[in-house]
A protein has these predicted regions:
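Ligand-binding pockets and gating/stacking loops
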Residues: 2-437
Length: 437
């Protein structure tokens, strides 16, 4: 383990140890003294600039699993040839702002994007960093925190009552935090392959609708005693999920998951890659008022041949995001849909002996677009070699709190887990108002 990794792991472990106790101790002291602790959010609100009334109603969240390189995408360093390596750069609409050479579509759309170039996190471990990004909290053995999609769906509710509020594309769901301690109905519906949609939704040829209804009725009668004996909100939630699934099987809204309904020229614009098809499916789902769609796209753990690996990975992402943003903008849905592009951490500016880049949590970049976002914004600054942060460092909780505010939600609202501990949607971070419209 490198010195950088050791430092961040120690900070991470200290964070886990202290994170949950500070507010409880302060609140306890305040209660004893008969006073209250002023919420930090109160001071944030006093200092926060006014934002427009346009807030996101839906979210499409692109998660780049494996840790995407900032040097080769949204924070290139062409003035440092040994750092930049063999991946070139491309100009954007803003003079002086450049992207990696494979981001040609997004360079043309830079006026619709907000780039955060000063992200930093506290661990270089994939699983821990992934969990922290998706939940706003470090891993704890005593509790499972909700993913951002579950948080947002819980607070904002369903729009389309016939469809699930939270869909997870290109992932089987293994290792995903899901609903955490929230209602089980907020668990994301997984779509492992966008071309197949939700599988096993059609009745087999030997089973008629009438026979299926009779079987459902019989199952309901058999389960009645169990439901009465073990009545509770969790059991009721699972029962409701089952009913919703049956309702979806017979409804027209299921077509939202069917990519065969799209014209071939549309599919070609998005591309045939997993992320291209995932982006197309995400567009169809938000058109049908699904609240939160997460699209996973793995393969960014480029320890070897980063230039060749980027050439095989980044163009598909650029094509998919470019097509999605243009389509949503054309239909007017970009005004109510927040698009997020994030990865668990970054990759080292220094190119290793295998022509790749290693794990690097100290500096990396994220992208926001759409509802609630100030297009053309570039926030924060990494140092001249992209190794650390020179200006305006942004932590994971700050970024997730920014998503929270973009959705019109209060990042200071507390939710209590079954063990009595308070948690917040964005983990109590400071929203980045400079990228909010």
């Amino acid at each position: 383990m490198t010195g950088v990794h050791t430092m961040f792991h120690k900070r991470y472990e200290k964070h886990v140890e202290n994170h949950q106790t500070r507010r409880a101790i302060l609140s306890g002291i305040a209660s004893t003294l008969g006073v209250s602790v002023m919420s930090p959010w109160t001071r944030v609100l006093e200092a926060a600039p006014a934002t427009s009334a346009t807030k996101a109603k839906k979210v499409i969240y692109f998660y780049m699993s494996g840790a995407m390189s900032h040097i080769d995408t949204f924070d290139p360093k062409p003035e440092q040839p040994s750092i930049q390596g063999d991946v070139g750069v491309v100009k954007t609409k803003t003079p002086g702002i450049m992207f990696g050479e494979h981001m040609t579509n997004l360079a043309e759309l830079q006026d619709k994007l907000a780039i955060v170039r000063s992200m930093t996190t506290e661990t270089a471990d994939h699983s821990k960093a992934r969990y922290w990004l998706q939940t706003s909290y470090p891993v704890l053995n005593s509790i499972r925190h909700p993913a951002m999609g579950a948080w947002v769906s819980n607070e904002m509710g369903k729009i389309n009552k016939a469809l699930p509020p939270f869909v997870l594309v290109n992932s089987g769901g293994n290792g995903h935090p899901g609903a955490g301690f929230l209602d089980p109905s907020l668990t994301p519906v997984p779509v492992a392959d966008p071309e197949k949609g939700i599988e096993n939704t059609e009745l087999p040829s030997y089973l008629t609708d009438e026979v299926f209804k009779r079987r459902l009725s019989l199952a309901d009668r058999i389960d009645a005693g169990f439901r009465e004996r073990y009545a509770g909100y969790q059991l009721e939630s699972y029962n409701q999920m089952y009913k919703d699934a049956v309702k979806l099987m017979g409804g027209s809204d299921l077509e939202a998951f069917d990519l065969t309904k799209e014209k071939e020229e549309v599919k070609e614009r998005y591309g045939s890659s997993k992320v291209g098809l995932g982006a197309l499916l995400a567009r169809r789902l938000v058109e049908k008022d699904v609240r939160f769609v997460q699209v996973d796209y793995g393969g960014w753990d480029m320890h070897n041949d980063v230039a060749g690996s980027m050439a095989g990975k980044a163009p598909a992402l650029d094509q998919a995001l470019g097509a999605l943003i243009r389509d949503l903008d054309s239909s007017g849905l970009l005004n109510e849909t927040l698009i997020v592009l994030a990865s668990e951490f970054g990759r080292s500016p220094a190119i290793n002996q295998n022509a790749g880049r290693d794990h690097h949590p100290a500096a990396f970049s994220y992208v926001l677009a759409g509802a609630g976002i100030k297009g053309g914004a570039v926030y924060g600054k990494s140092d001249e070699k992209g190794h650390g942060i020179d200006e305006d460092p942004v932590g994971i909780t700050d970024f997730n709190s920014t998503i929270t505010v973009a959705c019109g939600l209060d990042p200071n609202k507390e939710h209590f887990a079954p063990n009595g501990r308070p948690f917040k949607i964005g983990g109590g971070g400071d929203p980045i108002y400079d990228v909010l419209s």
